[in-house]
């Protein structure tokens, strides 16, 4: 598994599993809002009043509306205990 996928997949899966509302900013500046319904290697299915298939190469930023735990269903939690919108200053991994 590629290094980029090792963070991206658990992050998106936790957003999906916990039904966290998100704002997705595209590279052209457009803001989309909804919940992650599903995702794969290339796209994210974003659900609001309608479902939208958003290509990952068009995404700049994914912003959760509330704190959530990325590792709530995995065996080895990170030292930060999950993603809460704060960057972990402990980069000695």
Curated annotation (Swiss-Prot):
Organism encoding this protein: Shewanella sediminis (strain HAW-EB3)
Gene Ontology CC terms: cytosol
GO terms classed as biological process: regulation of DNA-templated transcription; regulation of RNA stability; regulation of translation, ncRNA-mediated
Function noted in UniProt: RNA chaperone that binds small regulatory RNA (sRNAs) and mRNAs to facilitate mRNA translational regulation in response to envelope stress, environmental stress and changes in metabolite concentrations. Also binds with high specificity to tRNAs.
Assembly, per entry: Homohexamer.
Lineage: Bacteria, Pseudomonadati, Pseudomonadota, Gammaproteobacteria, Alteromonadales
Region spans: Disordered: 70-93
Family classification: Belongs to the Hfq family.
Name the record gives this protein: RNA-binding protein Hfq
Source species, domain of life: Bacteria
HAMAP family in the record: Hfq
UniProt entry tagged with the keyword RNA-binding: yes
Coiled-coil ranges per UniProt: none
SUPFAM superfamilies: Sm-like ribonucleoproteins (SSF50182)
